[in-house]
Amino acid sequence: MELEARAEPRSPRAGRGEEEEDEDEELRLAKRRKVLCSEFAAVTSSDEAVASGFLAGSGWHLERALDAYFEAPMNEQTTAAAAGGGSAGPGSCIDLTADDTASNTSSSGADSKQQDDDSSFSLITWNIDGLDLGNLQERARGVCSYLALYSPDVVFLQEVIPPYLCILQRRAGGYTIIPGNVDGYFTAMLLKKPRVKVLKQEIIRFPTTSMMRNLLVVHVNISGNELCLMTSHLESTRDHSKERMKQLQIVLNKMQEESQSTTVIFGGDTNLRDSEVAKLGGLPKNITDIWEFLGKPQHCRYTWDTSSNTNLRIESKCKLRFDRLYFRPAAEGGHIIPRNMDLIGLEKLDCGRFPSDHWGLLCRFDVIL
């Protein structure tokens, strides 16, 4: 015998309360989806209609939607834009993965030659300005093009954001990628496979930072030599000079604590002024500023130069050596020696902007066998 289920009567006031909660939840969901659409559109240079289509198809998961977008052939991206009532736009014709095969083919000769040559290795450090979402897709492609061109063994990056990390993970398949965080903006280290063998890693948080800054430390082996690699983005702006100096002291202490049999290289966007280093009494005797070690070459002195780099479009013209590389050789002989240094990222892209508001630093090292 079936019994008819009857709902118990509820008061009109209780019903209104539940309806209001439902409406609030729907409003929060709508706002969240609008933010996701804006972020997707900014990264891909598409419109919100395209963003909505890819996000909806990926369960409103931003990273999955970006993966789907960058994996899609260009005609599918254009079709999605047309279906959404918008145009693909100038940015959406840039597919970061379309020329993967060509890039890998063109650089394979250089890669194999460098892997066979254990007498040298190269390193790039670069603040890629991921916080600037303008032309982000094309600027990211520009950075990846430099990585393909120079094929560095080690890359230090600062101001990486999650969508940019997705691009790097898809584009730089020949590298082990170690991020210093996964939220907000952070540093990342790229280590070429299989030449650079990762031994261990750690993240040291700066205890009094107000900008989520930390020190990413990775121990590796290159050509039989053990290295301790470190990168960081020290506290920004002139007003945070004291905090920046505290962070620098933590970095220098960590460099000195490492085993004397290990070569230590630190690099990143330090935001340092020379006067701040002087206030700390200069660098320890066993730690060298590589730019100074190489004779202070003027062509690569200023890595943040608003007189030449117009990305920020600010009227004041500043030239500062924010991006630096420090070196502590192994005590058991000079197995690794800095050879030269150059700036990269000096050419404007088709969008009329540079890959970043910072120039990158490319440094080459000799390995004494």
Swiss-Prot record:
Matching SUPFAM superfamilies: DNase I-like (SSF56219), UBA-like (SSF46934)
Binding site for Mg(2+): 129, 159
Ranges for region Disordered: 1-26, 80-117
Cofactor note: Binds 1 magnesium or manganese ion per subunit.
Biased composition regions of type Basic and acidic residues, renumbered to the chain: 1-17
Subcellular location, principal: nucleus
GO BP terms, alphabetized: double-strand break repair
GO cellular component annotations of the record: cytoplasm; PML body
EC number: 3.1.4.-
Catalytic-site annotation from UniProt: 269 (proton donor/acceptor)
Compartments where located: Nucleus; Nucleus, PML body
Start and end residues of each stretch annotated as Interaction with 5' end of substrate DNA: 127-131, 233-238, 271-273
Miscellaneous comment: Can partially complement the absence of TDP1 due to its weak 3'-tyrosyl DNA phosphodiesterase activity.
Name of this protein: Tyrosyl-DNA phosphodiesterase 2
Source species: Gallus gallus
